């Protein structure tokens, strides 16, 4: 049941010494991957999402403004183009914010649900690499939802339902954890409290059990971690954030 062996045996994916941590998808793997992408687009369209695509590389100034440079630079790949420093994106969020800021919006447009299958790169230590579970390049299923404060609870519940629908289809079991403010974070205590309260309120209305994971939130916000079990009973994490 080792997925790395199955990947080769079934012609799904492989890894090469020329690119450690960077998966090569084979013909059968692309058939499966494209079917999953088609399904992703179908369910997101039904849920009221629009789809965008943002560049895999953006200038370093953006990463300073977003806070990623101060909190995540050791995990980022960088380069210089025409004397301007750039970085491969480790997360899709800053690009998604640029798209939103590119045109004016009215409160009547909200909630605005935006989905992206963005390719991200993260400098993982070689000893931590493990098949497709821990890689240096992967496609991240991301959603950025722009909303008013009074819409937060319903939107979080909507995301949780979408995740539950997908996991149920594939027969995954999961449990939820609420991860709160870490020591290394941006934003004020008041902003963190408001965001955390929104997640707690939504979780309570969902009526499903969850545990609180103190101090394990992202540096930019609290999050709900969906821990699912694979066929070997190992725990994997799917993250949903406000």
Residues of each region from the PLM?
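Short acidic-glycine loop/turn motifs at beta-strand connectors
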Residues: 80-83, 147-148, 229-233
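Gly/Pro-rich turn-and-neighbor structural signature
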Residues: 37, 41-58, 62, 170-216, ...
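Extended, hydrophobic alpha-helical segments in both membrane/secreted and soluble proteins
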Residues: 40, 116-117, 139-140, 163, ...
């Amino acid at each position: 049941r080792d997925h790395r062996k199955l990947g080769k045996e079934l012609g799904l994916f492989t890894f090469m010494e020329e690119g450690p941590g960077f998966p090569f998808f084979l013909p059968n793997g692309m058939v499966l991957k494209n079917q999953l992408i088609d399904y992703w687009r179908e369910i997101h369209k039904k849920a009221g999402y629009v789809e965008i695509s943002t560049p895999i590389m953006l200038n370093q100034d953006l990463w300073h403004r977003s806070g990623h440079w101060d909190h995540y630079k050791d995990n980022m790949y960088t380069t210089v183009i025409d004397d301007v420093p750039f970085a491969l994106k480790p997360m899709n969020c800053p690009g998604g914010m640029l798209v939103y800021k590119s045109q004016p919006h009215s409160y009547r447009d909200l909630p605005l649900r935006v989905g992206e299958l963005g390719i991200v790169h993260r400098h993982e230590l070689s000893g931590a690499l493990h098949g497709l579970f821990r890689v240096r390049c992967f496609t991240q299923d991301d959603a950025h939802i722009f909303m008013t404060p009074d819409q937060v609870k319903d939107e979080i519940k909507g995301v949780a339902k979408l995740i539950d629908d997908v996991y149920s289809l594939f027969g995954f079991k999961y449990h939820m954890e609420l991860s709160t403010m870490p020591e290394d974070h941006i934003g004020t205590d008041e902003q963190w409290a408001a965001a955390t309260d929104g997640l707690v309120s939504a979780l309570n209305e969902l009526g499903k059990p969850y545990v609180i994971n103190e101090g394990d939130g992202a540096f930019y916000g609290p999050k709900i971690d969906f821990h699912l079990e694979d066929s070997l009973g190992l725990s994997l994490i799917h993250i949903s954030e406000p």
